[in-house]
Regions:
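Flexible, Lys/Arg-rich cytosolic regulatory linkers and terminal tails that connect or flank
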Residues: 1-26, 89-92
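Cytosolic Rossmann-like ligand/nucleotide-binding regulatory domains
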Residues: 19-85, 92
Length: 92
């Protein structure tokens, strides 16, 4: 797994996953509103933990560095989700 993934939970016969990940400053989604992120069709944001407070995500929710997000993803979209969580080379 790429980025700062905290947990992965398989659903069904590995047809889908719930991914819990901390957003890093170099992630392509850091600083963006959920509605502006190009998530694959089979991906839903289930929750956002900001400064210890769990929020129900809406389109205007801005994903910031340090947030913990819970994503539901169909198995076919996992690679793209990993790319969105990926740490860029500038991080090292």
């Amino acid at each position: 797994r790429h980025g700062r993934v905290r947990g992965v939970y398989s659903i069904g016969d590995a047809e889908a996953e719930i991914i819990e990940a901390k957003v890093l400053s170099t992630s392509p989604i850091a600083g963006q509103k959920i509605s502006d992120i190009d998530f694959p069709e089979g991906v839903l944001v289930g929750g956002v933990l900001k400064s210890g407070i769990m929020m129900k995500p809406v389109g205007t929710t801005r994903i910031e560095e340090g947030d913990v997000i819970a994503l539901f993803s169909l198995a076919k979209d996992i690679t793209e989700v990993e790319r969105l969580l990926q740490v860029s080379i500038d991080f090292f």
